[in-house]
A protein has these predicted regions:
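Repeat-solenoid scaffold signature
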Residues: 191, 200-213, 218-229, 234-236, ...
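C-terminal catalytic domain of Rieske-type non-heme iron oxygenases
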Residues: 475, 509-516, 693-698, 719-762
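Alpha-helical support elements that line or immediately flank enzyme active sites
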Residues: 148-152, 162, 342-361, 393-396, ...
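Extracellular/oxidizing-compartment recognition motifs
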Residues: 2-465, 473-474, 490-493, 510-517, ...
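Single conserved hydrophobic/aromatic residue that forms the stacking wall/gate
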Residues: 776-785
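Active-site-adjacent structural elements in folded domains
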Residues: 134, 171, 217, 388-391, ...
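Active-site acid/base region of carbohydrate-active enzymes
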Residues: 157, 227, 232, 247-253, ...
């Protein structure tokens, strides 16, 4: 018998996915053995239908590949379940067949949907916080239940209920997409929740990203109220089916959730709870008929990324501390970690007692919560007691916080009054870093916590203030680090679709995706280039050629747009049409602004060249040799234009900042005679600053690589080990538990930075993680893993 087994079978990056719409799903597995040097030499896949009949037998395929294996059987149909197994060979033998795994198809055709969109009556307006609707439908099943599926989605957020029980464990479902194009539906196995006789299906809706506050544009950016679509399909033992969908026969009412806003928080008045509203036997005589919605609905697509989940819980690290504020007692809870999520309240309170919970990342000099950096976001949850023992956990909001201030509790609250619930997209950890320096180890922990908090369905810049947007520049610089820390293949595959959906018809890419501003403006250098950089990074890390192929047309359209708007192949030219972008955002070498001293046309042209180089590699990977040659020629042409404009006859860079040097060196833009001079200038600048960096969002990820790739890893180490600001370790020495937005978010001599832009959970500078982890892996990957 072979001394190895096959385990962790995955389909489309998920274990046993329920409801997918990939017609040729990709399969993956792991070979497990204790023998060093073991290597798969061949594999065989067996796939069967629901009746156990063979759909596909791959036969023995000589290959060491164990990921991205495309199903090659007959065409799949809606709702079909496929069970599959794998056996593998190594040089010494063959494994037994793996344990069976499965995947199930979703609803592949629009005609599969018989349900329609429904909603409650219109309440409030763009400037008004509105209550959350409850929707319910009572129905009777005349036969026993063999199997059942609930296909459900919302414009907004939903929590589905069946017979008094929650359906699934997802949070903030169905997430955030480019609503003009598509919205994702979730599929749940609900057979165990149904019974013969009366049943009740229900849903609670929240505003979410669809009609709540999003970014800094206020409410109702996409729609005026949340909407629900749900289709319950029941299979009976005799093979017959019962289908129930949302329509005008559903009932709607407003209950205890008076406010459900991602940025502002929740207000739950437990006195308004309607016990049993989602279960049989409830009297819904006072409820109104739900409204059907006939508007231009987005396409319904199966969930293709990881679900948002409640991942872990944290208890306060100390007893709550009293804070006297104008004679009013407030209590401060410290969870010891800047996190993203909510707090669960568990208490016995008299009826009518109202607790106000305010969330913050930091404390001010007086020991009170610091909220100035939240701007207009309130991050406040309010709970009014119904009397007795009760538990409350917000459903449709999330906060960025370490501290929670509680107001209204009668007396001194116990430490276990609150429990922090950490929420983020469910991404398995895949990498770790540890060394002999505890500060660097804490830096790595801060990077990981920053990734957790900002990977909530969309890679956001920050999780606390009135922004929380999918900034493309932040995402592309951090993507290599993210892929080391966690399995982000499905996460970025989903977001890449958001980015493509936000693309303007002329090819330009906006600075954020989903695009809440609807102008689809040019995101500018290093931001809009995410359309090319992120899928290439995913290909390097996961070998995901389908992602490249699926978005190749979008990438080509983007490159064509750049060709049209870059006179003389100089992108972001001062005399050009498109905006010049954000420069080296928050660099310290500027004259007091936010964009740094590096010329924006230098950054733009450097990224134009890098985009052409990557497009050549992408085309080559896809077998498009003609395009590969064309983009290689384009890279050389842009390189010549870069040299002509930015490299002097003496071999120096015009605008010779740390970022300019790092980009020119890493992107291969310099003539051979200029490389040593530019690198020497970079080293001198770092030394002149006392082994400190001056880079912003654009230059920082490339700086340590530029140094180590040119034989001076010692300088990169000196930057890494620097404890005075600006440095990675400065925030660590100040007690940070996540990555700060600014190098000087807080200093002893100046206190807090400008509150309008001072997040304490901003992963961009955490891009150093890719360099840290490359030390273990020796080098950046030159081919897909």
């Amino acid at each position: 018998m072979a001394s190895f087994t096959v385990a962790q079978l995955r389909c489309e990056y998920r274990e046993n996915p329920l409801g997918i719409d990939e017609l040729r799903p990709r399969l993956a597995w792991q070979m497990r053995t204790r023998r060093r040097g073991a290597r798969q030499s061949a594999f065989q896949i067996l796939a069967r239908d629901e009746a156990g009949q063979t759909l596909w037998d791959s036969g023995k395929i000589e290959s060491d590949q164990s990921t991205q294996i495309e199903y090659a059987g007959p065409e799949l149909r809606s709702r079909q379940r496929v069970t599959w197994q794998v056996r593998v060979w190594d040089e010494g033998g063959v494994s037994v067949l793996s344990r069976p795994a499965w995947w199930e198809m979703g609803l592949l055709e629009p005609a599969d949907w018989t349900a329609g969109w429904i909603q409650g009556g219109l309440v409030g307006g763009p400037r008004t916080i509105v209550p959350a609707p409850l929707l319910r439908k009572s129905f009777t099943l005349a036969k026993p239940v063999a199997a059942a599926r609930l296909y459900v989605s919302a414009l907004g957020l939903f929590e589905a209920r069946l017979n008094g029980q929650p359906v699934g464990e997802d949070a903030l479902a169905p997430g955030w997409t480019e609503y003009a194009k598509r919205v994702r539906y979730h599929v749940h196995d609900v057979g165990s929740l149904l019974v013969p006789g009366e049943n009740v299906i229900g849903a609670l809706l929240g505003d979410g990203w669809y009609c709540g506050h999003v970014g800094f544009q206020g409410r109702q950016r996409y729609g005026e109220r949340p909407r629900l679509i749900a289709q319950l399909e029941v299979v009976h033992p005799d093979g017959s089916r019962t289908t129930l969908g949302t329509d005008g026969s559903w009932a709607v009412a407003y209950g205890p959730l008076l406010q459900a806003d991602l940025l502002m928080g929740e207000h739950w008045d437990a006195r308004l709870e309607m016990s049993g509203w989602d279960a049989p036997g409830f009297d819904a005589a006072g409820w109104q008929a739900a409204e059907t919605w006939q508007g231009a609905a987005p396409s319904l697509v199966a969930r293709n990324g990881p679900a948002i989940r409640r991942i872990q819980e944290l208890a306060p690290v100390a007893d709550p501390q009293p804070i006297e504020d104008f004679g009013v007692a407030r209590w401060l809870f410290d969870f010891g970690q800047n996190l993203v999520g909510v707090v669960r309240l568990q208490a016995t309170l008299a009826s009518g007692v109202t607790l106000t919970l305010r969330h913050a990342e930091a404390l001010d000099a007086d020991g009170r919560i610091y909220t100035a950096n939240l701007r207009s976001a309130q991050q406040t949850d309010i709970y009014t007691s119904r009397g007795g023992a009760q538990v409350y956990e917000p459903r449709f909001t999330f906060h960025g916080f370490r501290y929670v201030e509680v107001h209204g509790y009668p007396g001194a609250p116990p430490r276990d009054l609150l429990t922090a619930v950490v929420i983020h997209s469910d991404m398995p950890p895949t990498g770790a870093f540890s060394c002999s320096n505890p500060l660097i180890n804490q830096l790595q922990r801060n990077i990981v916590w920053g990734q957790k908090g900002n990977f909530v369905d969309v890679p956001t810049d920050c999780p606390q203030r009135d922004e929380r947007l999918g900034w493309t520049g932040d995402a592309q610089v951090f993507a290599p680090t993210a892929a080391f820390n966690m399995d982000v293949a499905a996460f970025f595959s989903k977001w890449q679709q958001d980015l493509a959906d936000a693309q303007h018809e002329n090819g330009r890419i906006p600075p954020i995706a989903p695009d809440t501003r609807f102008g689809h403006e040019d995101g500018g250098p290093a931001w809009a280039d995410a359309i090319v950089i992120v899928p290439w990074t995913m290909y390097q890390r996961y070998g995901d050629a389908r992602l490249l192929a699926r978005h190749y047309a979008s990438m080509k359209a983007w490159m064509a747009y750049l060709a049209e708007t870059s006179p003389g192949r100089i992108r972001a030219h001062p005399d050009g049409v498109p905006r010049q972008g954000y420069g080296d955002w928050l660099a310290l070498d500027g004259s007091g602004g936010t964009q740094g001293a590096t010329p924006r046309d230098l950054i733009g042209t450097a990224y134009y060249a890098q985009g052409a180089r990557l497009m050549g590699q992408i085309a080559q990977a896809l077998g498009k040799t003609g395009d590969a040659k064309r983009y290689a020629r384009l890279f050389e042409a842009i390189r010549r234009a870069f040299i002509h404009r930015f490299v002097t006859d003496d071999g120096l860079l015009i605008g010779q900042t740390q970022t300019a040097c790092a980009l020119a060196l890493r992107f291969g833009l310099l003539p051979a005679k200029a490389r040593s001079g530019v690198f020497s200038a970079l080293a001198r600048d770092i030394a002149a600053r006392g082994n400190r960096l001056s880079t912003g969002f654009v230059g920082t990820p490339h700086l340590p690589f530029a140094l180590s790739e040119n034989g001076r890893a010692d300088i990169a180490y000196a930057l890494l080990n620097q404890r005075d600001w600006p440095s990675w370790l400065y925030s660590v020495t100040q007690g940070a538990t996540t990555i700060w937005e600014r190098w000087d978010g807080w200093t002893k001599d100046k206190g807090f930075q400008t509150p309008s832009m001072n997040s304490f959970n901003h992963y961009a500078y955490g891009a150093i993680g890719a360099w840290l982890l490359s030390l273990i892996h020796i080098s950046e990957p030159t081919r897909p893993y």
